[in-house]
Amino acid sequence: MKEVILSHDSEAKIYIVPDEVADNLDKYCWDFAAKWVWHGPEKNRFLHEFSKGQFGVVFGAPDFIDYLNKWAFPEHQSRLIKGLGCYDYEIPEEYKHYPKYNF
């Protein structure tokens, strides 16, 4: 398990995730955001009609962690470690080497 930084246009937070996810964070996050939330078995959880016939999805880092825990890596439970008290573009120097993704 490795630490990564995830955000969704809000406070950046450190999560611990499986090594495979941390080492390929962009791929896992992109697959979740571009495929899973639209076509996965829980798509109705994310899909919202904003106006007649105009649909979109709403999700964030906690939803990605739920996906990892329930569907992708149930044998390795990911979890929140701590919030950094800043946005993804203000990461403190000591954490800049962490893999990061902003949804």
Per-segment meaning from a language model:
Residues M1-A22:
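Short, extreme N-terminal segment that most often corresponds to the first beta-strand
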Residues A33-F103:
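Short, mixed-charge low-complexity intrinsically disordered segments
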Residues A22-F32:
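Short, surface-exposed linear segments at secondary-structure transitions and domain or protein termini
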